[in-house]
Amino acid sequence: SYDVLSLNTGSYVPAKEAMPVDESVFTVKPIEKLLLARQRILEDLKDKDLKITVAGGGPTGVEVAGNLEGLAKNESGRCRITLVAGSRLLSGFKDSVRKHALKSLTSRHVQVIEGARVLAVKDCKTELSNGDVLDNDYVFMAVGVKPSSLFIDSGLPVGQDGGMLVNKFLQSVAHPELFGGGDCISFQPQPLAKVGVYAGRHNPILLHNLLNALNGGVLQEFIPQGTFLLALNMGDGTAVVRWHSLIWGGSLGFALKNYIDRKFMKAFQA
C-alpha cells in the first residue's frame, strides 16, 4: 500500500517487438547494450571490414552513425555505415540543422537513405520499405521510444504514446496520489519531446510535490521551457548545435556539449 507513488519507469525502443531475436541487432536503450556492441565491433575490426546499418533518422540515429564512423576511424578499421533515416533526416528540426548533420555524415562516407525505413532484419540482411536489401554485420535500432505498457495494462488514463496522462503538477489526471516524470508520462497541457532536458527538470518538481502531497502543502506546476539547447555529438570531435535561431557546427560546439554533459554527470556521481 502507499499514500503517494512516483512512477518513473522510463521508456524503451520497441523495435524488437517486430524483429527476430538476433545477436547482431542492438537497440540504443538500455545503454549497456551499446557498450557490449562497442566491444564486439572493436574485436571484429581487427580482422575484417564491417557493414553496419543504423535505423532511425532522429538525433539518436545521427549520433550513433557519426560515432560508429569515428570509432572505426580511431581504430584504423574499415566500416561501411548506412543510416536509414525514415521519411527525412531530422524531420522534426529546421532544415539548417539537417543540412549541417547531413554534411558531417556524408563527408565522412556515411550513406544516408531518406524515404525508407527498416522493415525486417534476418540472416545478416536488412529489408527496407523501398524494396532495397542491405547486407550488414550489425544493426542499431534508434527508431524512437515508447513508455512501458504498465499504464495501459493498469487501466490508467494514457496519452497517444501510452504514457501515463498527467496534469501540470505531474499528477495522474485520474488518481491524484500518482505522480510521474520522464519518458513514461504524457503531459496533458501540451505534447513534450522525449528528451533528457525535460526529464531532468521534472525531478525537483516531483520531489516538491510528493512531499507536499503527504503534508497537505501547495503543489508546484511544471512549466516547460520554450526551447532547449540541441547539441549532436557527430563522433569526430565536432557537434551540430542549435540554440534558439542560432545554428552552427564544429569543434566549439562539441566543447560546449562536452562541458554541459560532464557537469551534469558529475552532479549525480555516487
What is the meaning of each model-derived region?
Residues 7-55, 59-74:
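Glycine-rich dinucleotide-binding loop and its adjacent helix/turn
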Residues 73, 197-225:
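Internal hydrophobic alpha-helix adjacent to the cofactor/substrate pocket in enzyme cavities
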Residues 70-168, 218:
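A Rossmann-like FAD-binding core segment of flavoenzymes
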